[in-house]
Amino acid sequence: MPESIIAGIPVHFPFEPYEVQRAFMEKVIMCLRDGTNGVLESPTGTGKTLSLLCSSLAWIRTRQSEHQINMQKLQMEQQQRQATGGSATGAISDLALTMGKANNWGVPKVIYASRTHSQLTQAMRELKRTAYASMRSVVLGSRDQLCIHPDVMKEQGNSNKVNMCKLKVHAKTCSFQLRVESKKDHPDFRGPSIMDIEDLVKVGQRLKMCPYYASKELVSSADITFMPYNYLLDPKARKANKIELSNTIVILDEAHNIEKICEESASVQIRSSDVAMAIEDVTHIMKIFTSADSQDSGGPEEPKDFTLDDLTLLKEMLLELEKAIDGVVVENQVEGTTYPAAHIYELLGKANFTYGNCATIVALLDKLVQYLMVASQHSMLRKGGSFMVLSDLLNVVFANKEDIMAKVHRSFKVHVQIEDTKQTKPAGNSNSKQTGWLGKGNNATSTVSKTAKIINFWCFNPGFGMEQLLNTQVRSVILTSGTLAPLKPLIAELAIPVAQHLENPHIVDQSQVYVKIIGTGPDREQLISNYKNRDNPKYISSLGQTILNVSRIVPDGLLVFFPSYPMLNQCVDAWQASGLWADLSSRKPIFLEPRGKDQFTSTMEEFYQAIRDSKGACFMAVCRGKVSEGLDFADRNGRAVIITGLPFPPLKDPKVILKRRYLETNRTKENQLLSGQEWYNLDATRAVNQAIGRVIRHRHDYGAILLCDARFQDASQVQQLSKWIRGHLGARPQSSPFGPIVRELRQFFKHAEQTMVQPDERVVEPPLQIVCKEEQPTLTPSYNSNTQIKREPGSGVNKFQLASELAAKAEMANSIKSWTPADYVNAAGCTNQSQTAPNAMDFMSRLNSNVTSIDFNNTDLVKIHKRERSSPTANESLTSGKKRFKLISSTDMVKTEPGTSNSCSYGNTSSSGSDSRCCSAKPAEYPLKEAPESRADFLREVRSVVDSDKFRSFGKALLAYKTGGDNCFEVLMVLLLDVLGAPKLRYLLHGMRRYLKNEHKEEFDIRLASLQAS
């Protein structure tokens, strides 16, 4: 790879770096060299991740070389001094002085942190493309993602999995964890390849070794460790994962939300119901202790790590805490009441929770959780969730040392709200009348108390989290994102010394981006999404007409971002009622961002698939949602983004009110904090900047940015937009009449299509790859290029695969191999699949059991996209003139294609795979080939060798075969012959065997043998 000297360090970059990349890498290296901190902004699409990795690892590699030279020098001096009878320790002292600060003695390590594991996976894929791929790396994940023990994985919720895992490890009953010591040096695990979460799980399954604990074995020797934010910023998580930060380089990527993350990591909440359940749980354990037949009660039989006296004392403290919470006065029953930070210490002090006994009580609570995890396997006991809530409260509240209480009082507030409780019977009802320590105490109905409360301990100073980070003696902290500006308020809030800062311009030319403020719609109605105007029918109609007119011009993908889910739903309802929705969906199939994580991945894959159609697709989402924060809509996936309004936080939200009040109270000329109103405006604009960043993703990308709110003309709003966007708006941004904008927009895309290099068709797995629920009717395509589909992921799929592998696949299927000139215009393929031959039903398990569809011309069905996407009923007649989905029963779904019959012959080639049965074969006309073993590669090859109509038929037949009986196998065989029957394609026909149901393989072999002999 080309080598560039940047800030005196040789950096190997995949190609000659652009100027913005050189500037970025220079700032990174200066931070590392000087041991200082940096805040660096570089727009999305400028190769920020690649620049971060190459510059930091180049500096590390240089330091490693220097360290090796110094150690050799030390050894030589030791030998010389010993030869002359001198002391060897003097050489060590001299060398330590020459190397400067004590924390410079060793070679620093890099911690690369980002918000999500899918972002970390993308970063690791970037690392694989560099000259530094051989450097040692590891990624840290949660048990939820890495655990392969079946008993742990069947637990619901991450906290239950954590405690079940701890229990099995403590009891030495997890065979996977016990193998870590013997398998941790296995070549498959210690090999040179970079392993992400998915790779760790696969290696762990192959070696029958715990990936979670095995990954920790790599941390001490890793040059770079990838982890999510919470592992880094949460002191408890750092301790649990044994993360050593001294002399470490900390890179916080996607740091535009770092203030909120720091505040949330220092905040905590407890409810009256949590305390009441903790009392019940302690009571249950005490009953087990005192029961005469406790050995037969189904409870755990091993010796306890606590005594009845411990339980008695804890219950007394909990009862006092419950009493103290009940005594808190809430003057405003709707919005709640705010108290100073000292109130939380007074509240806990009444129950004797103090700095002195906090650690002891937390240790006891952890033991009780472990105890209940065992007991819950034999009875209906809860699993100690209330103890975990109390433990979190104590850990957060007492993490702030007594000597900084003045700062705590300035930065924290206690906000008390009324808790809505449900009338439920207390657990252990048969003994509810008991008194004394086995009873519920004086307040026996506390679970259903009408005055149950929520105690919030909120932090409003993100500097707390960053200060804890800096106190660990890190070498450098580098914050970077595409949307950090304005930098001064960010630096002021985080309260860290920053020596290097950067606001990079974008790498694209002016001609590649069209940015306009649209202040009025086609009907000249003002477009302004403020609180007063949001219910205005004229505004909603005008906004819809604006989107409709833009959708007629924008090719391929169109993104529309709303300020909130309620606003999105309100517009959809209005457009549905007026008929505008039908007009919109006739131009482009419309996808709505789902709130649920399970539906999100499948929706994204369906959108990417719909982009392949000539009409493209429209995705409507919300600012601050999953789509706006982390996904890539490069090239055809996103040619324009419409921002329908400014996503201000809820004005009357107690947390927003208190944050604004905190800033106003603590703002001085010296600290340069924002005013409350400035923060409020900036919070909205940063969300807009993130949404805008979804579109222009690389050097040769192009697109339009349309700001459909008249308030974007305000100078205060414009100044908070990213620097590269401001450059397109000019010195005095003004909204333009709608007519000229339409003409300019049409001309922009016409010119771009003529002058810009157009990307090749993306390689995307067909819709039949989507994971679907088996037990619910779902939405599946009838394989018409004009249809749009929605499906939900299946509950039977491994959760890691659902949450991590599929999320990464949705993003990576859309990503571009950025910054490699030869590949710039080619879309990236899907991630490499395992080379192991897939299980037969693994292929078919991704096909849906029922086929239903959406008619986008029928506005009554819009709620399918809007909420849970329940399947519609099939009572509409179908017309050929409109784009719609058909409701098709699984038995009628696949019909023999014209020109085929059940009497057709079948083609085959022999295979050497162990799964195949050998057949006598005639000499082939074409050289024998082997079908790809990977399911994804197999489908891509089929798609590449047959026309689109046959591939759709192929998909329909596979779907029907998955859900149907033996008759569907007959239909599938006819279809396979039609699609893959040509002599040169018979290797693919033979490769289909591994994906058939076991009961059909023998018949398949007989027919292939018969064909080959004919």
Curated annotation (Swiss-Prot):
Task: Quote the biased-composition stretches of kind Low complexity, using this chain's numbering.
Answer: 899-917
- Intervals of motif DEAH box: 253-256
InterPro entries, per the entry: ATP-dep_Helicase_C, DinG/Rad3-like, Helic_SF1/SF2_ATP-bd_DinG/Rad3, Helicase-like_DEXD_c2, HHD_RTEL1, P-loop_NTPase, RAD3-like_helicase_DEAD, Rad3/Chl1-like
EC no. given is: 5.6.2.-
Leading EC class? isomerase
Per the record's keyword annotation, is Membrane included, yes or no?
no
- SUPFAM superfamilies documented for this protein: P-loop containing nucleoside triphosphate hydrolases
**What is the protein named?**
Regulator of telomere elongation helicase 1 homolog
The species this protein belongs to is Drosophila mojavensis
